[in-house]
């Protein structure tokens, strides 16, 4: 009987130990943590943001690059005398009418042709005190100015000389040379480093000593070959002007 009880107790003990071992194994088995799948996104940590480069100025529409490099300056009787509208141009060889009806002179008409052919800017040399409305009286006044060495005051002035590198300079021949208003003009400005291109209208004397006088007045400028036009043919001088400009390489 005792032997039977001992056997039952031993069997119960074995079962109890087996159950405890299973529980321990269950409790000590760690559950792995849940890991979410990685998201495939670009690594931007090393990429700089696209921001405007402050070191570079913003591009703005440039102002006109068509800087007018040519100035067509001229002195003419018709724009320096108190001539009445409708004055008879046939009564004076030095008076001409433009297409718009404004009064100019022989030199002014040639200046218009040069400006149109080159794209240059017209500039009328005007005196503060006008000359007489009679051409003969004007010639006498011009002779008195020359004899006395008088430089007439000018009322027109170039405001932006730096914009021009080529200066056409036109005038009539008065008393075998330039009108004194041209000397006033040359005295007012320093054309050093610029190119002066003279043109003259005359009754047959051409430039006389005008070229050397321009060179003396503006020693720092380059003076090119000039064009002499007879006063009576000024209105029809387009071909002569075109050929001259082409020879100089200044045609537009």
Language model regions located:
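Positively charged n-region of N-terminal signal peptides that target proteins for export
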Residues: 1-9
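Domain-scale selection of a single, long terminal region
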Residues: 8, 20-21
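C-terminal motif of bacterial Sec signal peptides marking the signal peptidase cleavage site
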Residues: 15-19
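Active-site-proximal alpha-helix that buttresses catalytic centers in soluble enzyme cores
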Residues: 21-252
């Amino acid at each position: 009987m005792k032997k039977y009880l001992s056997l039952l107790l031993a069997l119960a003990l074995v079962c109890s130990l087996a159950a405890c071992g299973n529980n321990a194994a269950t409790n000590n088995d760690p559950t792995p943590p849940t890991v979410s799948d990685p998201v495939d996104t670009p690594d931007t940590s090393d990429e700089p943001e696209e921001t405007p480069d402050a070191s570079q100025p913003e591009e703005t529409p440039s102002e006109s690059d068509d800087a007018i490099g040519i100035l067509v300056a001229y002195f003419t009787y018709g724009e320096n005398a108190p001539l009445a509208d409708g004055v008879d141009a046939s009564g004076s060889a030095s008076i001409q009418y433009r297409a718009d009806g404004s009064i100019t002179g022989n030199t002014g008409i040639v200046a218009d042709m040069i400006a149109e052919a080159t794209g240059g800017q017209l500039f009328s040399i005007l005196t503060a005190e006008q000359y007489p409305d009679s051409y003969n009286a004007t010639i006498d006044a011009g002779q008195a100015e020359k004899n006395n060495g008088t430089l007439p005051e000018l009322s027109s002035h170039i405001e932006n000389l730096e914009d021009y590198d080529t200066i056409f300079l036109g005038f009539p021949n008065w008393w075998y040379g330039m009108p004194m208003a041209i000397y006033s003009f040359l005295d007012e400005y320093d054309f050093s480093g610029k190119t002066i291109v003279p043109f003259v209208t005359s009754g047959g004397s051409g430039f006389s000593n005008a070229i050397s006088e321009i060179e003396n007045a503006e020693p720092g400028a380059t003076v090119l070959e000039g064009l002499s036009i007879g006063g009576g043919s000024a209105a029809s001088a387009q071909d002569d002007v075109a050929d001259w400009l082409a020879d100089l390489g200044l045609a537009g």
